[in-house]
């Protein structure tokens, strides 16, 4: 009988700063060559589980351990981090924390340099893996010139060079555009088949992850494994809902169409599911009997106008933004999508005045070009993807009050505005808390509050739901919808096709610094050419429509959006 390569036996771990164990009585074996998906809500113990395997716990992060953990038949608590790194390779979720080279090539070559590999062999290895991860054209770029997704691919290439028998990827899809995420899963699958390595993928994005095949799924909740089963059996159970994880959209649509999902043999394979005549009949019947009107109306008077806006970095020959023409309308929820490096974040920074531009930007027919960053912040607020990059104060109240104090407002007036915004953001009860006591999602709301308190007309959010489990995803989006109802214009830069289709009234698609589409989300996702150009990927609802033979897939998508919104409001 094959011995497990990873074995947890009654294993518990408690951080010194925590009152209770983060992992509780974990019992699981993972065998050589297995590919395992690990899912769970924020704080469920997924990353702690992975860090116990790669050695960051206990060799870097200390805590109390009970039980046993064996890696490659060796007691994991008595080896060292260096030895563990020869067995376990890890791609971290925080790409900035893993990037150590001055260029992409230097970062990927780090291990080879330490192992004194000959330069010719080093260059061949780096070029080979850079080609595999789609970074061959960016090898000489500095880390600050790369997007979050590009940094992640560099980290992946650097780990793959090592060829460790165990590979852990912590949220590998979090910063990638949908098409690149799909290609990454295909790449990982090819690597797994070629090397027969043991692969553990920790992810929130269950639907996208299940594009790939997994031997097992481990589902975490409150530090415990509540499911250890096949993807199909997990989708049939109620465990995902119990753990606060969103099931694939097609599974929800099947239930809305009153399909008995428990009777489906391989629920994790959408193509197989849609071969059933019963499924085809039920879904088509649901479409025929239900109206799919799209009530989204976004056009009023333009609030923000961009005319022939260009941005060019000094060390790039081509413009990062190229003659962008764009109107943003009052009280709309606009999504901006595109491939990694398309210019999405650059566009936001150009609007805020962080970058020099050519062309013209107007706000309510008022020239924006001559205004300083501080003056523009009275009209436009920008919330960065990572809240830790924005927060500079120790206490919640002080962080939200920071901008008003910088404007010289009286403390009595600041108190009124800050407390009002904290109530709107659901943070009033925590107003005297330290920032470090907050979850990632709560920190995200603090950064939104720090922008909202300045009362801008437009709020730009870069990846508002990145890395969020379904509970916190809904929490953030419900909050943004409420702000929109109160009159704020919301611009969301996103890779999340669910967010795009369910929450925005209009979508602008960028590719290579240019606007290639400006229409409704459903029409964007129904256009295969646009999806290919911008590295988007149609959701499982579109795939379901095609497999079933629905001539107008957008009808199914719009029907699902309308019905799902109605269900969530109940």
Swiss-Prot record:
Family annotation (SMART domains): AAA
Q: How does it sit in the membrane?
A: Peripheral membrane protein
Q: Does the keyword Cell membrane apply?
A: yes
Q: Which GO CC annotations does the UniProt entry carry?
A: ATP-binding cassette (ABC) transporter complex
* Keywords of the record: ATP-binding, Cell membrane, Membrane, Nucleotide-binding, Repeat, Translocase, Transport
**Binding of ATP 1: at which residues?**
40-47
Q: What is its EC number?
A: 7.-.-.-
Matching CDD domains, A to Z?
ABC_cobalt_CbiO_domain1
The record's GO molecular-function terms, alphabetically, read: ATP binding; ATP hydrolysis activity; ATPase-coupled transmembrane transporter activity
Q: Where is the ABC transporter domain?
A: 6-247, 304-537
What's this protein's function? Probably part of an ABC transporter complex. Responsible for energy coupling to the transport system.
Protein name per Swiss-Prot or TrEMBL: Putative ABC transporter ATP-binding protein SAS2569
Which species does the entry assign this protein to?
A: Staphylococcus aureus (strain MSSA476)
